From Swiss-Prot:
Superkingdom to which the source organism belongs: Bacteria
Organism: Bacillus cereus (strain ATCC 14579 / DSM 31 / CCUG 7414 / JCM 2152 / NBRC 15305 / NCIMB 9373 / NCTC 2599 / NRRL B-3711)
Protein name, entry field: Phosphate import ATP-binding protein PstB
Catalytic activity: phosphate(out) + ATP + H2O = ADP + 2 phosphate(in) + H(+)
Function (record text): Part of the ABC transporter complex PstSACB involved in phosphate import. Responsible for energy coupling to the transport system.
Family: Belongs to the ABC transporter superfamily. Phosphate importer (TC 3.A.1.7) family.
Domain ABC transporter: 25-266
Amino acid sequence: MVATVVNVQVKNEEKIETAPKKVVFDTKNLNLWYGEDHALKDINLSIHENEVTAIIGPSGCGKSTYLKTLNRMVELVPIVRTTGVIEYRERNIFDKSYPVEELRTHVGMVFQKPNPFPKSIYENVTYGPKIHGIRDKKTLDEIVEKSLRGAAIWDELKDRLHDNAYGLSGGQQQRLCIARCLAIEPDVILMDEPTSALDPISTLKVEELIQELKKDFSIVIVTHNMQQAARISDKTAFFLSGEVVEYTDTNKLFTTPSDKRTEDYITGRFG
Protein backbone atom coordinates (compact mmCIF):
# COMPACT_ATOMS: atom_id res chain seq x y z
CA MET A 1 0.00 0.00 0.00
CA VAL A 2 1.50 3.32 -1.05
CA ALA A 3 -0.21 6.55 -0.12
CA THR A 4 -0.01 9.44 -2.53
CA VAL A 5 -0.49 12.73 -0.78
CA VAL A 6 -0.86 15.91 -2.79
CA ASN A 7 1.86 18.47 -2.00
CA VAL A 8 3.25 16.56 0.97
CA GLN A 9 7.00 16.10 0.82
CA VAL A 10 8.68 14.01 3.47
CA LYS A 11 12.24 14.51 4.53
CA ASN A 12 14.72 12.47 2.51
CA GLU A 13 17.15 11.25 5.13
CA GLU A 14 19.76 8.53 4.92
CA LYS A 15 19.31 5.73 7.41
CA ILE A 16 22.17 5.84 9.86
CA GLU A 17 22.49 3.23 12.58
CA THR A 18 22.46 5.01 15.93
CA ALA A 19 21.91 4.01 19.52
CA PRO A 20 18.26 4.02 20.62
CA LYS A 21 17.20 7.37 22.05
CA LYS A 22 15.98 7.58 25.61
CA VAL A 23 12.26 7.69 26.26
CA VAL A 24 11.08 11.02 27.66
CA PHE A 25 7.37 10.26 27.96
CA ASP A 26 5.99 6.73 28.14
CA THR A 27 2.19 6.61 27.97
CA LYS A 28 0.59 3.34 29.05
CA ASN A 29 -3.10 2.51 28.67
CA LEU A 30 -4.17 6.13 29.12
CA ASN A 31 -7.90 6.80 29.15
CA LEU A 32 -9.43 10.22 29.73
CA TRP A 33 -13.01 11.37 30.15
CA TYR A 34 -14.61 14.80 30.10
CA GLY A 35 -17.59 13.92 32.23
CA GLU A 36 -19.18 11.06 30.28
CA ASP A 37 -17.28 11.81 27.06
CA HIS A 38 -14.51 9.23 26.57
CA ALA A 39 -11.95 11.51 24.88
CA LEU A 40 -8.80 9.34 24.96
CA LYS A 41 -8.97 5.56 24.66
CA ASP A 42 -6.16 3.19 25.64
CA ILE A 43 -3.33 5.43 24.47
CA ASN A 44 0.07 3.72 24.36
CA LEU A 45 2.82 5.93 23.00
CA SER A 46 6.50 6.58 23.72
CA ILE A 47 8.12 9.94 22.97
CA HIS A 48 11.91 10.04 22.60
CA GLU A 49 14.41 12.74 23.45
CA ASN A 50 15.80 15.14 20.86
CA GLU A 51 13.08 14.30 18.37
CA VAL A 52 10.12 16.19 16.97
CA THR A 53 6.98 14.13 17.44
CA ALA A 54 3.96 15.32 15.45
CA ILE A 55 0.37 14.49 16.35
CA ILE A 56 -2.10 14.71 13.47
CA GLY A 57 -5.76 13.90 13.01
CA PRO A 58 -9.14 15.53 12.32
CA SER A 59 -10.73 18.06 14.66
CA GLY A 60 -12.00 16.52 17.89
CA CYS A 61 -9.79 13.44 17.67
CA GLY A 62 -8.00 14.05 20.99
CA LYS A 63 -4.74 15.60 19.76
CA SER A 64 -4.74 18.67 21.97
CA THR A 65 -6.25 16.79 24.89
CA TYR A 66 -3.35 14.34 24.82
CA LEU A 67 -0.82 17.16 24.53
CA LYS A 68 -2.28 18.97 27.54
CA THR A 69 -2.24 15.75 29.52
CA LEU A 70 1.55 15.58 29.23
CA ASN A 71 1.93 18.58 31.55
CA ARG A 72 -1.39 18.06 33.34
CA MET A 73 -2.92 21.27 32.00
CA VAL A 74 -5.97 19.20 31.16
CA GLU A 75 -6.68 19.03 34.89
CA LEU A 76 -7.76 22.68 34.76
CA VAL A 77 -11.06 21.28 33.46
CA PRO A 78 -12.88 20.17 36.64
CA ILE A 79 -14.83 17.28 35.08
CA VAL A 80 -11.73 15.46 33.79
CA ARG A 81 -10.74 12.03 35.07
CA THR A 82 -8.03 9.67 33.87
CA THR A 83 -6.85 6.11 34.20
CA GLY A 84 -3.52 4.67 33.11
CA VAL A 85 0.01 6.00 33.43
CA ILE A 86 2.19 8.64 31.83
CA GLU A 87 5.81 8.37 32.90
CA TYR A 88 8.10 11.36 32.46
CA ARG A 89 11.70 10.18 32.76
CA GLU A 90 10.36 7.01 34.45
CA ARG A 91 8.27 8.90 37.01
CA ASN A 92 4.46 8.73 36.92
CA ILE A 93 3.21 12.28 36.42
CA PHE A 94 -0.13 11.37 38.04
CA ASP A 95 1.57 10.32 41.28
CA LYS A 96 0.27 12.52 44.10
CA SER A 97 3.85 13.00 45.33
CA TYR A 98 4.80 14.67 42.02
CA PRO A 99 4.05 18.42 42.27
CA VAL A 100 2.50 19.74 39.07
CA GLU A 101 4.63 22.88 39.38
CA GLU A 102 7.77 20.75 39.21
CA LEU A 103 6.47 18.89 36.15
CA ARG A 104 5.78 22.15 34.34
CA THR A 105 9.32 23.41 34.91
CA HIS A 106 10.45 20.40 32.86
CA VAL A 107 7.64 20.50 30.31
CA GLY A 108 6.99 23.90 28.73
CA MET A 109 4.15 24.81 26.39
CA VAL A 110 3.58 27.09 23.41
CA PHE A 111 -0.03 27.71 22.43
CA GLN A 112 -1.88 28.12 19.14
CA LYS A 113 -2.33 31.88 19.44
CA PRO A 114 0.65 33.97 20.54
CA ASN A 115 -0.07 35.01 24.12
CA PRO A 116 2.56 37.46 25.35
CA PHE A 117 1.90 39.13 28.68
CA PRO A 118 0.97 42.85 28.59
CA LYS A 119 4.47 43.68 29.74
CA SER A 120 7.81 44.53 28.19
CA ILE A 121 9.72 42.00 26.13
CA TYR A 122 12.25 41.76 28.96
CA GLU A 123 9.56 41.15 31.58
CA ASN A 124 7.94 38.47 29.42
CA VAL A 125 11.15 36.45 29.28
CA THR A 126 12.07 36.92 32.95
CA TYR A 127 8.59 36.12 34.26
CA GLY A 128 9.26 32.40 34.77
CA PRO A 129 12.77 32.73 36.24
CA LYS A 130 11.51 35.34 38.71
CA ILE A 131 8.72 33.00 39.84
CA HIS A 132 11.45 30.45 40.55
CA GLY A 133 13.31 32.90 42.74
CA ILE A 134 15.89 34.43 40.42
CA ARG A 135 16.31 38.12 41.20
CA ASP A 136 19.91 38.94 40.28
CA LYS A 137 19.88 41.49 37.43
CA LYS A 138 23.00 40.12 35.73
CA THR A 139 21.61 36.59 35.79
CA LEU A 140 18.27 37.76 34.41
CA ASP A 141 20.02 39.72 31.65
CA GLU A 142 21.91 36.57 30.67
CA ILE A 143 18.71 34.52 30.64
CA VAL A 144 16.99 37.07 28.40
CA GLU A 145 19.80 37.07 25.86
CA LYS A 146 20.21 33.29 25.90
CA SER A 147 16.46 32.69 25.55
CA LEU A 148 15.95 35.22 22.77
CA ARG A 149 18.95 33.81 20.92
CA GLY A 150 17.52 30.33 21.40
CA ALA A 151 14.28 31.52 19.83
CA ALA A 152 16.21 33.12 16.94
CA ILE A 153 14.89 36.59 17.70
CA TRP A 154 17.68 38.30 19.69
CA ASP A 155 18.95 40.37 16.77
CA GLU A 156 15.44 41.67 16.10
CA LEU A 157 14.66 42.58 19.70
CA LYS A 158 17.94 43.35 21.48
CA ASP A 159 17.37 47.11 21.15
CA ARG A 160 13.68 46.89 22.06
CA LEU A 161 13.76 44.91 25.30
CA HIS A 162 11.73 47.47 27.22
CA ASP A 163 9.08 47.90 24.53
CA ASN A 164 5.65 46.40 25.14
CA ALA A 165 5.39 42.90 23.67
CA TYR A 166 2.02 43.80 22.14
CA GLY A 167 3.88 45.98 19.64
CA LEU A 168 5.48 42.95 17.98
CA SER A 169 4.20 41.21 14.87
CA GLY A 170 2.35 37.91 15.27
CA GLY A 171 5.40 35.91 14.24
CA GLN A 172 7.64 37.83 16.62
CA GLN A 173 5.13 37.37 19.44
CA GLN A 174 5.13 33.61 18.90
CA ARG A 175 8.92 33.43 18.96
CA LEU A 176 8.87 35.58 22.09
CA CYS A 177 6.52 33.02 23.65
CA ILE A 178 8.99 30.31 22.68
CA ALA A 179 11.78 32.36 24.31
CA ARG A 180 9.64 32.72 27.44
CA CYS A 181 9.30 28.94 27.47
CA LEU A 182 13.06 28.46 27.03
CA ALA A 183 13.79 30.81 29.93
CA ILE A 184 12.75 28.17 32.48
CA GLU A 185 15.12 25.66 30.82
CA PRO A 186 12.58 22.92 30.10
CA ASP A 187 13.42 19.42 28.94
CA VAL A 188 10.37 19.10 26.68
CA ILE A 189 8.47 21.72 24.67
CA LEU A 190 4.81 21.08 23.82
CA MET A 191 3.43 23.04 20.87
CA ASP A 192 -0.28 23.22 20.12
CA GLU A 193 -0.75 24.42 16.53
CA PRO A 194 2.03 27.02 17.00
CA THR A 195 1.88 28.39 13.45
CA SER A 196 -1.83 28.22 12.62
CA ALA A 197 -2.29 31.96 13.29
CA LEU A 198 0.88 33.01 11.44
CA ASP A 199 1.64 34.09 7.88
CA PRO A 200 3.78 31.80 5.66
CA ILE A 201 7.05 33.66 6.27
CA SER A 202 6.60 33.59 10.05
CA THR A 203 5.59 29.93 9.82
CA LEU A 204 8.83 29.12 8.00
CA LYS A 205 10.87 30.88 10.69
CA VAL A 206 9.15 28.90 13.45
CA GLU A 207 9.63 25.62 11.56
CA GLU A 208 13.33 26.36 11.09
CA LEU A 209 13.54 27.20 14.78
CA ILE A 210 11.94 23.88 15.74
CA GLN A 211 14.64 22.03 13.79
CA GLU A 212 17.30 23.90 15.76
CA LEU A 213 15.57 23.44 19.10
CA LYS A 214 15.38 19.66 18.83
CA LYS A 215 19.16 19.51 19.24
CA ASP A 216 18.64 20.48 22.87
CA PHE A 217 14.99 19.71 23.57
CA SER A 218 12.34 17.09 22.88
CA ILE A 219 9.38 18.59 21.02
CA VAL A 220 5.80 17.39 20.69
CA ILE A 221 3.71 19.35 18.19
CA VAL A 222 0.01 19.13 17.39
CA THR A 223 -0.76 20.24 13.85
CA HIS A 224 -3.65 20.10 11.38
CA ASN A 225 -1.12 20.76 8.64
CA MET A 226 0.08 17.42 7.27
CA GLN A 227 2.66 19.14 5.07
CA GLN A 228 4.12 20.69 8.20
CA ALA A 229 4.22 17.37 10.04
CA ALA A 230 6.00 15.80 7.07
CA ARG A 231 8.53 18.63 6.89
CA ILE A 232 9.59 18.94 10.49
CA SER A 233 8.90 15.77 12.48
CA ASP A 234 10.83 12.58 13.08
CA LYS A 235 7.83 10.54 14.20
CA THR A 236 4.11 11.06 13.65
CA ALA A 237 1.09 9.76 15.54
CA PHE A 238 -2.28 9.68 13.79
CA PHE A 239 -5.18 10.10 16.21
CA LEU A 240 -8.78 9.28 15.32
CA SER A 241 -11.80 9.33 17.64
CA GLY A 242 -9.58 9.38 20.72
CA GLU A 243 -7.40 6.46 19.63
CA VAL A 244 -3.88 6.18 18.24
CA VAL A 245 -4.40 4.53 14.87
CA GLU A 246 -0.75 4.56 13.85
CA TYR A 247 2.52 5.83 15.30
CA THR A 248 5.76 5.43 13.40
CA ASP A 249 8.58 7.23 11.60
CA THR A 250 7.16 10.20 9.71
CA ASN A 251 8.57 9.09 6.35
CA LYS A 252 6.95 5.68 6.73
CA LEU A 253 3.58 7.03 7.85
CA PHE A 254 3.29 9.38 4.87
CA THR A 255 4.56 6.93 2.23
CA THR A 256 3.61 3.43 3.37
CA PRO A 257 1.02 3.68 6.15
CA SER A 258 0.09 0.35 7.69
CA ASP A 259 -3.56 1.19 8.43
CA LYS A 260 -6.21 1.95 5.81
CA ARG A 261 -7.63 4.74 7.98
CA THR A 262 -4.25 6.49 7.99
CA GLU A 263 -4.04 6.25 4.21
CA ASP A 264 -7.57 7.60 3.84
CA TYR A 265 -6.79 10.57 6.08
CA ILE A 266 -3.46 11.60 4.58
CA THR A 267 -4.80 11.26 1.04
CA GLY A 268 -7.74 13.54 1.85
CA ARG A 269 -10.57 11.01 1.76
CA PHE A 270 -11.79 12.44 5.06
CA GLY A 271 -10.68 15.02 7.57
